[in-house]
Amino acid sequence: VHITWVGSTDWSEEQAGFNGHVGTTFEYETKSTDNYLGKTVKEYTKTHEIFQAYFSQPNWQFAAIYGLKSIDRRQEEKGYHENETSLQNYISLNKTFTIGNGFDFSLVYDLMYTDGNIDSPYVTGLHTVTVDNSFRPTLTYFNSDWNAGFYSNVEYLYSRNDKSSWGVREEEGQSILFQPYKRFGAWEFGIEFFYQKKHNDEFNHGKINDRSIYTETYYEPIIKYAFENAGNLYLRTRFGHGKTENADSLQYNANRTYFKTIRKATLGYEQNIGDDWIAKIEYKHAWEKEHKNFYDPRDEEKYNVLNQDNIYVHAFYRF
C-alpha cells in the first residue's frame, strides 16, 4: 500500500480524507505431488474471503486491512484422505513516513490467526491453530523525470502451527526483496529479486521430529500494460531455487539436504468499473522439482515433483 502524505490543519479536515474499500475474494487451488515414495498426492483448497475492509487516512499516512476467510482443504492419495476446514482472521497495519526526493519509508505488520479442524481415517475433529506474524520495513522510490523507481523491504516472520496430538511446527526467518521498475508510456517493466532464510522446528510432547533450515532465492521479471479503459494486464515469471538442510531429524531423514528448482508464472487483469468498483482475476501455475543428496551410492535417485494451479478473483467497492 502506497500512501502519500498531505498536510492537515484540523480534525475535521483529516476525517474528510478518509477512504478505502470493502469487498470479497475467492481462490481455488489444486496441487498434485509425485513424492519420494512413488505416490501421487492430490490437494484441493477453496478459500473464500467472506469480507475484506481496507481503510486509508492519507493525512495520517496510515492504512489498515481486516479480512475474514473460510478455507476448505481436501487431500487425497491411495489409501488415505484428509479434510480440513478453517476460519482465518487477519489484519494488516501500514504506517508511512515521507522522506522526500521521491522516497517513502513504511512500517508494515501483518497478523493472521487460523482456527481449524482435520478429519481423516485416523482422527475426527483434530483441532489446529496457526498464528502467522510478519513485520516489514519498506523503502520505495519514484522519479517522475525518469519515470522509474523501486520497491524494497526486509521481513521478519514467525509462524506457529499447532495440530494438537499431531504436534507443533514453528518457523522463524528473515527475507529481503528488491524490485526496480521503469515505465514507457502504457508499459511498465520490472524485476523482483528475493532471498529468504527460515529455521523450522517440528516437535511433539517436547521431542524433536524435524529441525531444518530452508533458504530460497528467486528473480521474477514483471511486465505490465495499462489500457485506456482503466484496465491493467500483468505477467510475472519466477525462476528460483530452494535448499532444505536437515540438521536434526528422524533417523531416516537426518542430515539430508534437499535441493529444489522453482518455476512460477502469474497472469492477471484488473479493471476499474465506473468510479466505485474494481474487479480482478488472476491465474498462477507453479512447478517445483526437489531431490536429495545420498550418502550411499547404491541409493536410487528419486524426486518430489509438484504442480500447482491457482485461480483468484475479487470485487471491491471503493468509498
Language model region names:
Residues 1-56, 64:
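Outer-membrane beta-barrel initiation region
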Residues 3-13, 49-57, 89-95, 135-143, ...:
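Residues on the lipid-exposed face of transmembrane beta-strands in outer-membrane beta-barrel proteins
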Residues 12-22, 58-65, 99-107, 144-154, ...:
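Repeated loop/turn-to-beta-strand initiation elements of outer-membrane beta-barrel proteins
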Residues 29-39, 71-79, 114-122, 159-171, ...:
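Outer-membrane beta-barrel proteins
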Residues 104-106, 138-249:
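Detector for outer-membrane/organellar transmembrane beta-barrel domains
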Residues 283-285, 303-319:
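Outer-membrane beta-barrel "beta-signal"
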